[in-house]
């Protein structure tokens, strides 16, 4: 049986893999809707991985930002501005997920670049504090 810490580390490694392979690949191929979805996955898995390492259960929903700010923000050394930014990123990517998945909106290069930058920010902030 795996521990919460091991489960969390696995989620963080998966987030890193998706970032390096899928998200970067979608950007290179100019598949902007896929880039939005992969950025959302990176953020969701990063936040949930960190929560899991801390032994915090999370709901099985795509938006984890508010719980992360509330719980992990207390236990880890994040400044308020960083937490606010993580919550904003998590919210907008969770909201963009369905339209990008079902083709309800054609996301642009600028949207995808923003998503990429935001996912990179979140994964770097989590990585700096989780020591996986």
Named regions from a protein language model:
Residues 1-132:
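Terminal alpha-helical segments
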């Amino acid at each position: 049986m795996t521990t919460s810490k091991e489960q969390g580390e696995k989620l963080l490694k998966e987030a890193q893999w998706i970032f390096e392979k899928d998200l970067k690949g979608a950007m290179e191929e100019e598949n902007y809707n896929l880039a939005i979805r992969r950025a959302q996955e990176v953020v969701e898995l990063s936040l949930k991985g960190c929560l899991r390492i801390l032994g915090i259960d999370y709901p099985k929903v795509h938006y984890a930002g508010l719980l992360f700010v509330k719980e992990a923000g207390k236990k880890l050394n994040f400044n308020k501005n960083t937490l606010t930014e993580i919550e904003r990123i998590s919210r907008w990517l969770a909201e963009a997920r369905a339209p990008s998945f079902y083709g309800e909106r054609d996301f642009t290069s600028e949207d995808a670049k923003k998503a990429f930058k935001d996912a990179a920010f979140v994964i770097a902030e989590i990585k700096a504090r989780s020591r996986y």
